């Protein structure tokens, strides 16, 4: 190119980049930091007019221009564009070709392989050819001892199915991810929860990295050293417990919108959960009512309490993450930390409001009682005591708790909270995106997030809470708990899908109040395997696969979320799912294909289905390597990691479906 062939311009020609508009509820960005961004320079290249194709190679690096040049020089793909496309196609065929399918229709197979492809896209390699990478401290490091640096960990989404799937079909990479996350702790100081290009971001809820690490460690402990178990426990312990001094001057904890990322990366939620047993919903409100007129019972201590919000979602997820840390502590042989975090993991019980008289008023669209016994619910701390928090004015509901807004009012007036419990009813349909009591949903969806202790969840649903001190055995479930668990599941899937007109845009793909289009509910269809009616898991999973997944431009429900939505489909189509990441076991669903062969750690695992069809959705019998499955239709990771066979016999007759094991 000659000097006249290219023109460099400033970012002012791309003004929209600097004019960041915050989402509803998001704080306004700092003007000075945005001004700095606007002064950054991009390069605009004008190649003039030509009838010939222009072939350009672009190299990127997280370390700088020199790194990008080295990466470009190391490229051996050549300059034939069509040939490079073919090389890419062959590379993907080599990966996807490891998976063999028989049966099913063309659309099912297209959907399966497309979904499988999406699960392999991220996290992706984020280091130069010479091993240099940018760490979480903003500095350039040299990868040693086989370390591989990855980026794009959307872990609040992907800990649920995408990462567990990798432990099955791509074990070595799953191990690399765990080691990479531990290295990010070492270069940054805490584990990330949504890492992007060596930046913490602080996006979403809780501390999902501990789930990702625990899951691969419990499945393949032989791959890790005692020192790595100790490091994982240290990283988890320091990450989930707020430390005001730890991040005082850290570069990675500064950004344009939040300034100090202690607001979102290392929050104070767990301090309250451990001290008082739950996260008060009024933590962020100042006692002097300075920031929210009327909130005279606010608890706010300092600015770091401002984002102690979404108390129920944080409380439930943190209880599960504490359980994950306990599993790491067990591997590390640290009994004290195991007992501490197992005790903390029981705190989900403090959010459940058992009130069958009140919630028994809820009805389906035909006027039938739903049978709900209670919900996970926010609570205030008022004069040292826990008080349930309300979210709607009673005058906006009828006698069956259905929305009935009086003339002269609108929905916003019904839900406005200008004083502690000015609202006088807790309405389970009220949905929220962010910033209130729940994250991207309502209590219908969030009530089910206690995957680490489903028996304990069933017991509180039955009004029989059991406070444990001995964690050597799982909690026993009572008969009343079993009945209530089933009743509440049925209520979820039969509730009105359109009850709340303020639903978050992340809420889509409704079956009752179950939401397939967002992550918190992804395990819920499989919970019928813990009831006397396990065939309902097969019905719901089949319905979700057929209604919400299609190989078309608009065929995927919700947000793909870096492979999680697709990973749910892949595992469900194979016929099994992991309800509790961190526990090396799986439960069954409804297999979509007559035969599927997938790569596993040390061989091939085969799923076969006799009498399989679109109508034969019920499981008549099932074995793993010729043996009957365990309770709740489960089998262990050890049953598949060396290869083997999961064999189904299907039927279209619901009366022939297997009963509870």
Question: What does each of the following model-derived ranges do?
Answer:
Residues 1-149, 226, 230-241, 651-661:
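Acidic/polar, glycine-enriched structural segments that form the non-catalytic walls/loops
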Residues 36-49, 626-643:
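Short, surface-exposed beta-strand/turn "edge" patches of beta-sheet domains
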Residues 60-63, 593, 614-616, 628, ...:
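Extracytoplasmic low-complexity repetitive segments enriched in small/polar residues
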Residues 101-158, 166-254:
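N-terminal core-entry segment
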Residues 145-160, 168-169, 210, 223-346, ...:
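Active-site core of glycosidic bond-cleaving carbohydrate-active enzymes
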Residues 601, 624-627:
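Short strand-turn-strand beta-turns centered on an Asx-Gly dipeptide
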Residues 610-612, 629-660:
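Beta-strand-rich ligand-recognition modules
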Residues 617-621:
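Beta-strand-rich binding/interaction modules
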